[in-house]
Swiss-Prot record:
Positions with biased composition (Basic and acidic residues): 1-13, 35-49
Protein name: UPF0561 protein C2orf68 homolog
Taxonomic source organism: Danio rerio
UniProt biased composition (Basic residues): 50-64
One of the Pfam families matching this protein, by short name: UPF0561
Start and end residues of each stretch annotated as Disordered: 1-98
Family assignment from sequence similarity: Belongs to the UPF0561 family.
């Protein structure tokens, strides 16, 4: 609205049919931004619905894990390199680890003073004395350390055997 003043400034008159001057175009930019925002929101909503509708009848992964199947080694002499590598691998692993295939209770990680870490899997059927002996073979342990390790391993085994 425009205000018209008289020369003296006492009487104030309003221009008839007063409206906002929209020639600056400011609201046009606001409306354009609102329309762009609405279009974007609509696209995002449609994408989410499309993603929700993609459910298939088959599950993504099998309900039961695949069974492990024993595949025997082929012992024909045609591939000596492959068989030799497999035999070397079997020889390099220690026999004590292969003997104990019972119920696994926990991993035993022993860190020596020099920072070397020795790891063993402790099984339900293992005896704490045997485990301490295996750790002592790979690390230098005095009698007090052996006794402390024996007590701790026995305590952990009893705690985990009671839970199972």
């Amino acid at each position: 609205m425009e205000v018209i003043r008289d020369g003296e400034g006492e009487s104030v008159k309003y221009k008839p049919g007063g409206r906002l001057d929209m020639s600056h175009g400011f609201l046009r930019h606001i409306r354009r931004n609102q329309i762009a925002r609405d279009d974007y929101d609509r696209e995002v909503k449609q994408a989410k619905e499309k993603q929700r509708r993609r459910h298939t009848n088959t599950p993504r992964r099998p309900r039961r894990p695949d069974r492990q199947v024993y595949n025997p080694r082929i012992r024909n002499g045609s591939e000596p390199g492959v068989n030799a590598e497999a035999e070397d691998w079997n020889e390099s692993s220690s026999g004590t680890e292969m003997e104990n295939t019972g119920t696994e209770l926990f991993w035993l990680d022993y860190q020596a003073d020099n920072g070397k870490i020795t790891s063993f899997i402790v099984h339900k059927e293992d005896k704490p004395e045997v485990i301490v002996q295996r750790v002592a073979e790979k690390n230098v342990l005095d009698s007090s350390m052996r006794a402390a390790l024996l007590a701790r391993v026995g305590q952990e085994m009893n705690k985990r055997c009671d839970k199972r």
